[in-house]
Amino acid sequence: MTQPPGQPVFIRLGPPPDEPNQFVVEGAPRSYPPDVLARLEVDAKEIIGRYPDRRSALLPLLHLVQGEDSYLTPAGLRFCADQLGLTGAEVSAVASFYTMYRRRPTGEYLVGVCTNTLCAVMGGDAIFDRLKEHLGVGHDETTSDGVVTLQHIECNAACDYAPVVMVNWEFFDNQTPESARELVDSLRSDTPKAPTRGAPLCGFRQTSRILAGLPDQRPDEGQGGPGAPTLAGLQVARKNDMQAPPTPGADE
């Protein structure tokens, strides 16, 4: 006997209907003062000159204007469109796709707690909950002093060091709720701890300029080489004289 059809299931696609326009924040600049515009044009010229096709410079240009206001503003989006000969819709489509481009003002330090599967199981959820309680903010919110913006983030490809906390995209490995609390306290007291690896921390706006491809003035000496989990596979391969298979057609 054929069963009667069930009730239809409606699936909502896209953002919730009550979500505000992603790039319209009260007080956000819609144009740059002449001196700021001139400075950004110099930087943009250097960035665009690296690409044979101007529109290929869109991603670094978005980082450039993000470094001006700590998030993407109507002024920044318009600047990118004007520099590259794109429409506002084309720029906004790219900017809204990538989560590294911020849609609201960001603190001096963007603290991201990985809550993807492995980090969550290893303590990432507990770390995020502890920081929410300690800082008095939720996901994508900024402390009242403007120093820390907290967010949960997806995998940072550092699962062998789980749970991982990122500060302005620098790694802090093998964190605990207590060490993460000490980390954000060091940021708010202007005595930031050194990342587990990589360059010393700098502010979010300067980080955005570095991601745009502009000079990085931080010391280039590493703060610790690869850890044991990263090297384990290489050590096993060497011990067993394991070699990568030859590339097909390499001898032809």
Swiss-Prot record:
It catalyses: a quinone + NADH + 5 H(+)(in) = a quinol + NAD(+) + 4 H(+)(out). Binds 1 [2Fe-2S] cluster. One of its GO terms (biological process) is respiratory electron transport chain. [2Fe-2S] cluster binds at residues 114, 119, 155, 159. Its EC number is 7.1.1.-. It holds the Pfam family 2Fe-2S_thioredx. Keywords: 2Fe-2S, Acetylation, Iron, Iron-sulfur, Isopeptide bond, Metal-binding, NAD, Quinone, Translocase, Ubl conjugation. PROSITE patterns: COMPLEX1_24K. There is a cross-link at residue 45 (Isoglutamyl lysine isopeptide (Lys-Gln) (interchain with Q-Cter in protein Pup)). The modification N-acetylthreonine is found at residue 2. InterPro entries: NuoE-like (IPR002023), NuoE_dom (IPR042128), NuoE_N (IPR041921), Thioredoxin-like_sf (IPR036249). GO terms for molecular function: 2 iron, 2 sulfur cluster binding; metal ion binding; oxidoreductase activity; quinone binding. Residues 211-252 are annotated as: Disordered. Its cofactor is [2Fe-2S] cluster. It comes from the Bacteria. Belongs to the complex I 24 kDa subunit family. NDH-1 shuttles electrons from NADH, via FMN and iron-sulfur (Fe-S) centers, to quinones in the respiratory chain. The immediate electron acceptor for the enzyme in this species is believed to be menaquinone. Couples the redox reaction to proton translocation (for every two electrons transferred, four hydrogen ions are translocated across the cytoplasmic membrane), and thus conserves the redox energy in a proton gradient. This is NADH-quinone oxidoreductase subunit E. It comes from Mycobacterium tuberculosis (strain ATCC 25618 / H37Rv).
